[in-house]
């Protein structure tokens, strides 16, 4: 399980150093093999350990290529999926096209989201957090049943 938000730097080659607290579990779970793709709804990237990504691929394979919306999701997620291998120094090379898509520069936020990470440009991340808090404070929408049952 991945949690927390950590600022990491991309080096000049587009590599990010995975925080040490995640390296051991990633090596155990996936031998450091990861898959990175775009997020369909946010200006960030999604980074999955390979076994978790394979579950996503199975779900995508069950979608109909004859349904335009389903094919679009397949095309976007699979078409942008890029495998990356954690090297001996715990670094992952993020493909240039993916970095460009998410507007990633030097400072990047690695955000744990249960079974995956999100990769955000640092400034975009902080703006998104502010926007999310503002939306929560001003929303008039009733909470879903799942959120009503969530006790923090």
UniProtKB/Swiss-Prot annotation:
Superkingdom classification of source: Bacteria
UniProt subcellular location: Cytoplasm, Nucleoid
Residue ranges of domain SpoVT-AbrB in the record: 5-52, 81-124
Gene Ontology MF term list: DNA-binding transcription factor activity; transcription cis-regulatory region binding
InterPro entries membership: MraZ (IPR003444), MraZ_C (IPR035644), MraZ_dom (IPR020603), MraZ_N (IPR035642), MraZ_sf (IPR038619), SpoVT-AbrB_dom (IPR007159), SpoVT-AbrB_sf (IPR037914)
Main location: cytoplasm
UniProt xrefs under SUPFAM superfamilies: AbrB/MazE/MraZ-like (SSF89447)
GO biological process: negative regulation of DNA-templated transcription initiation
A GO-annotated cellular component: cytoplasm
Alphabetic keyword roster: Cytoplasm, DNA-binding, Repeat, Repressor, Transcription, Transcription regulation
CDD domains (UniProt xref): MraZ_C, MraZ_N
Entry keyword Nucleotide-binding: no
Transmembrane segments: none
Subunit description: Forms oligomers.
Record family assignment: Belongs to the MraZ family.
Function: Negatively regulates its own expression and that of the subsequent genes in the proximal part of the division and cell wall (dcw) gene cluster. Acts by binding directly to DNA. May also regulate the expression of genes outside the dcw cluster.
Protein name: Transcriptional regulator MraZ
